[in-house]
From Swiss-Prot:
Catalysis performed (reactions): cytidine(34) in elongator tRNA(Met) + acetate + ATP = N(4)-acetylcytidine(34) in elongator tRNA(Met) + AMP + diphosphate
EC id: 6.3.4.-
The protein, known as: tRNA(Met) cytidine acetate ligase
Entry's localization field: Cytoplasm
Biological process, per Gene Ontology: tRNA modification
Database matches in HAMAP family: TmcAL (MF_01539)
Lineage: Bacteria, Bacillati, Bacillota, Bacilli, Bacillales
Molecular function in Gene Ontology: ATP binding; ligase activity, forming carbon-nitrogen bonds; tRNA binding
TM regions (residue ranges): none
Keywords: ATP-binding, Cytoplasm, Ligase, Nucleotide-binding, RNA-binding, tRNA processing, tRNA-binding
Function according to Swiss-Prot or TrEMBL: Catalyzes the formation of N(4)-acetylcytidine (ac(4)C) at the wobble position of elongator tRNA(Met), using acetate and ATP as substrates. First activates an acetate ion to form acetyladenylate (Ac-AMP) and then transfers the acetyl group to tRNA to form ac(4)C34.
Pfam families attached to this UniProt entry: HIGH_NTase1
Record-listed ATP binding positions: 81, 142, 167
Entries under InterPro entries matching the protein: Rossmann-like_a/b/a_fold, tRNA(Met)_cyd_acetate_ligase
Length: 393
């Protein structure tokens, strides 16, 4: 965050944040409201939600939704972390792909026909068409997402500029702490759910406010969220579904439904199910997203109605500092998308999916807290933060 502010000289900082489920197809550790508090306490001025229909998607759709929201908010510059760290290389890679589009598409098809996943086929195709050191490594997850951010900016004819910060020490999927001060999200999550989990182990790697809010959430609601806690619900749902039922679920391709129903029979945990399910063609992340759609009962028809090929249909405001509130007041008339401070009176297919996802997310919380959280989510107004006193209002 501090590096971003230093690099961009920004007046205000806006974060577009996933809701209950994340792009890699798993539940967020804590609710979006607690994560909003974390972001505000760490210097973000406006926190807005990326709807489920965009947030639990491949990088291209995820980026398209996020950029459309930032565009609507009249953001002048974005900043993202990447393994490469040189913004010129991203633009150069996009240019090469555009010039070699026919060859690139042919190679992707060729590698997929050989049994590779789309992600692997795309990565291999890039290796074949990219030869200069001025191109990015498209096998790295943050490079891929950054590439799609810039591609979305260009596709949406935005005047937004892009900056990137190089990720050091820890890689995105590292499962252990390899540095004294920097850790991957994967390693932090693994530590939190280990047998001898302790918040003290992760404190050196996260802001003090984040550690405090994580501990507070677990104390208040009795848990942090991961896939294993939803496995009994997930297995029950699959055991009552037919192949035809599964085929209606978003991201379930023909043939995958039979493999899923077969492997669930002998799986006693989500991890063992995923180990049995994954293949060369279907990556872990791709399958986790499909499993998320099964859990939330998100159908192909619902995603079609959400019209994800276009921009996000609204802006759900989750939190703001006083500086962020001033920015919104000054620019409200210029912002063309509706800004939602709650969702109880707004109706849209994208929001219907969001409401289901929230209901599923809180299903592991014990009553009566579960019902309270579900009622609050639709009526919850944006969290306000006074950055001068470092207090929530």
């Amino acid at each position: 965050m501090q590096q971003t502010k230093k690099l961009t000289h920004s007046d205000i900082t806006i974060a577009v944040m996933s809701g209950p489920f994340l792009q890699r197809g798993e539940p967020a550790l804590v609710s979006k409201w607690y994560r909003t508090k974390m972001a505000l306490a760490c210097g973000v001025d406006l926190v807005v939600e990326l709807p489920y229909a965009f947030s639990t998607q491949k990088a291209e759709t995820f980026a398209n939704g996020a950029i459309s929201i930032l565009n609507a908010l009249h953001v002048s510059e974005i900043c993202f972390g990447s393994e490469d760290g040189q913004i010129e290389n991203f633009y150069n890679t996009i240019s090469v792909q555009k010039n070699e589009e026919e060859t690139f598409n042919r190679l992707v098809k060729q590698f997929m026909n050989a049994g590779n996943s789309y992600a692997k086929a795309t990565s291999e195709a890039f290796l074949h068409i990219l030869s200069s050191e001025k191109n990015i490594d498209m096998s790295q997850p943050n490079n891929i997402l950054g590439f799609q951010y810039i591609k979305a900016i260009l596709m949406q004819n935005s005047s937004m500029q892009a900056q990137t910060i190089k990720r050091f020490a820890s890689h995105y999927h590292d499962e252990t702490f390899n540095d004294q001060h920097i850790a991957s999200a994967t390693s932090i999550r693994k530590q939190l759910f280990s047998e001898n989990s302790s918040f003290k182990e992760i404190e050196p790697f996260i802001p003090k406010a984040t550690a405090s809010l994580l501990a507070s959430y677990k104390q208040n609601y009795g848990t942090l969220h991961n896939w294993e806690q939803y496995f009994s619900f997930f297995k029950y749902k699959l055991m009552t579904m037919s192949p035809e039922d599964l085929r209606h679920i978003y991201e379930i391709e023909e043939g995958l439904e039979h493999r899923i129903l077969s492997k669930i029979q002998t799986s006693s945990s989500f991890h063992s199910f995923m180990e049995a399910l994954k293949t060369k063609r279907y990556t872990w992340t791709r399958l986790q997203r499909a499993c998320t759609h099964i859990l939330t009962n998100t159908t192909k028809e619902e995603i079609h109605c959400a019209n994800i090929e276009q921009h996000a249909p609204y802006i759900r405001l989750l939190g703001m500092s006083q500086k962020g509130q001033t920015y919104l007041s000054k620019n409200k008339k210029k912002i063309e998308l509706p800004i939602l401070t709650h969702t109880k009176t707004f109706d849209h297919p994208t929001l219907h999916i969001e409401q289901k996802a929230n209901s599923v997310y809180f299903s592991i919380i014990q009553e009566p807290l579960r019902t309270q959280l579900l009622k609050q989510d639709a009526t919850h107004h944006p969290i306000r933060y006074d950055e001068t006193t470092a207090k929530f209002l």
